[in-house]
């Protein structure tokens, strides 16, 4: 839709180029769905069609896919990886020797991007800003994430049992049912269903404890009319900056105190401040930077 550039997607279940099944592999304290061994003929057909190949999280493609070296590549790095991972990746990338432009979505992903290129470019994640949204003034808490330690569903579970929040509804988008949870579980909804859930809630809790590089769901939640309350992870503070409402990560006492104090404030004004802060992630503003990379590299 931009500058008459035609784009197609090569990936699992893509309508353009379906690369086949994925494997769910534990990685970086989570579970990643990875196309480790894509359909080789379809992959090469997709690459042959393109002038520029834009790859998100290039580690697996660079190591396992045997990419042709006669193409223009742009690599976008999202993950916040520890020093051990980045040390080995830097060595491996020197062996692979595929040149390309390296992009990172946040400061937390910078060290990841530098393993491939010493001068990466910052282009944040982006969404289409909803111009006609207002704060959802409802008593609904929302959690989004897998039931794994770093997503910290446990705090959400504990909140659902608190007497002081018995007038609130608790809803979670996650990957499995939770026994004795005092709320509603949505198991792996599709994008349309997810959007409806966001628009029907009002308070999004990002309770993550580590290994986050950006936090796109924070922006999605605000863009759907939710106020966001999050742990004080660097990645989250980079996204929301002064508009953020933060508690000390891993401290349930801090979360309870913050919620109590926040609910004494004007939630509509707090949401408006957050909504104003996410304007810098508007796709219309940021996609132009990728277009320049496509055309000039």
Model-predicted regions and their roles:
Residues 37, 175-176, 184-198, 209-211, ...:
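Conserved active-site histidine-acidic residue motif and adjacent donor-binding/catalytic loop
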Residues 55-61, 77-80:
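Short His-centered aromatic/hydrophobic patch
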Residues 97-132:
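Donor nucleotide-sugar binding/catalytic pocket of nucleotide-sugar-dependent glycosyltransferases
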Residues 131, 264-297:
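A charged, aromatic-enriched C-terminal amphipathic alpha-helix characteristic of glycosyltransferases
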Residues 133-151, 157-161, 171:
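Conserved donor-binding/catalytic core segment of Leloir-type glycosyltransferases
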Residues 227-230:
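Short hydrophobic beta-strand element within catalytic cores of glycosyltransferases
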Residues 244-253, 260-265:
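Conserved acidic donor-binding segment of nucleotide-sugar-dependent glycosyltransferases
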């Amino acid at each position: 839709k931009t500058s008459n550039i035609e784009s197609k997607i090569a990936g699992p279940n893509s309508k353009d180029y379906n690369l086949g099944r994925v494997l769910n592999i534990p990685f970086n304290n989570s579970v990643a769905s990875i196309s480790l061994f894509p359909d080789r003929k379809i992959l090469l057909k997709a690459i042959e069609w393109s002038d520029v190949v834009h790859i998100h999280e290039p580690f697996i493609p660079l190591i396992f896919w045997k990419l042709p070296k006669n193409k223009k590549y742009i690599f976008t790095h999202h993950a916040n990886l520890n020093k051990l991972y980045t040390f080995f990746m830097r060595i491996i990338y020197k062996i692979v020797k595929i040149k390309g432009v390296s992009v990172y979505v946040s400061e937390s992903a910078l060290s990841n991007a530098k393993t491939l290129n010493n001068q990466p470019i910052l282009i944040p994640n982006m969404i289409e800003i909803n111009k006609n949204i207002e704060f959802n003034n409802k008593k609904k808490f929302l959690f989004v994430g897998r039931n794994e330690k770093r997503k910290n569903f446990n705090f959400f579970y504990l909140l659902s049992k608190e007497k002081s929040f018995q007038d609130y509804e608790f809803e979670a988008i996650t990957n499995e049912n939770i026994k004795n949870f005092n709320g509603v579980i949505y198991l792996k909804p599709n994008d349309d269903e997810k959007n409806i859930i966001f628009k029907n809630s009002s308070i999004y809790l990002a309770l993550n404890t580590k290994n986050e590089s950006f936090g796109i769901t924070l922006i999605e939640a605000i863009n759907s009319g939710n106020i966001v309350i999050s742990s004080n992870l660097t990645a989250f503070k980079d996204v929301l900056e002064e508009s953020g409402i933060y508690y000390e990560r891993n401290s349930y006492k801090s979360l309870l105190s913050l919620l109590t104090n926040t609910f004494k404030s004007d939630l509509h004004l707090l949401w408006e401040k957050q909504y104003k802060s996410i304007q810098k992630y508007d796709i219309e503003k940021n996609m132009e930077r990728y277009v320049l990379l496509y055309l000039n590299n």
